[in-house]
Amino acid sequence: MKDNISEEEVRKFNKLAEEWWNPDGSFAALHTLNPLRFNYIKNWAEINKKKCLDIGCGGGILTESLSKYADHVDGLDMANKAISVAKNHQELMGIKNITYHNSNLEKFVEINHEQYDVLTCMEMLEHVPSPEQIIESCSKALIGGGHLFISTINRNIKSYLMAIIGAEYILKLLPQGTHEFDSFLKPSEIEQWSRKSGLNLIDLTGVMYNPITKTFKLTDNVSVNYMMHFRKE
């Protein structure tokens, strides 16, 4: 199987690694978004004392939130500098139930043969060459009845204007060049791939940003940012 890795994306996020835990830095939007996405996960899945895998964990923002409830969390990312930052912050916070891995998902699943109650794949699918391959591996890593949570960006004119022009160039919520329009994904594409891998769609919810209040909220509008919840058969 060909490595499902974009070296350009890895370099991009390695350059930003020291910014991960700066709430006013390049990942400020993720710090603002994190409580919303974490509560979404908690509302749909029981994570207390469960085993979780955070795919594309970066510096560990969501990983640490999951660790407050889960029995154990594995965090996975291809950006080695982001993993170093995540490990350092884990040590600083005295967290014992996280293990970070500098690996891609496919190799991790092949080597570890572990199965998880909850998988999170947030703001990650749009950064790999084959998102379908990621979803297939997610299914392999889940127990029967396990939960998969995905968040990404829709592909249409509105999402280009808002997620790239607006977020990166006008509001400067993200560094310029964070996203490529051609890598955005329609919910129907993700659902089709997931169904092929034995994952059933439970929920599809939009995420909207208010530039005046600088807050995120859930919405029925999935035209730009959205989250999906799947369960394995």
Language model features: what each stretch is:
Residues 1-21:
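N-terminal, positively charged/glycine-rich alpha-helical extensions of SAM-dependent methyltransferases
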Residues 31-50:
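Conserved alpha-helix/loop element of class I SAM-dependent methyltransferases that forms part
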Residues 50-56, 149-171:
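Conserved class I S-adenosyl-L-methionine
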Residues 61-107:
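Class I SAM-dependent methyltransferase SAM/SAH-binding core
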Residues 132-144:
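A short glycine-rich, Lys/Arg-flanked "PGG" loop and its adjoining helix->strand segment in the class I
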Residues 172-189:
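Acceptor-substrate binding/catalytic loop of class I
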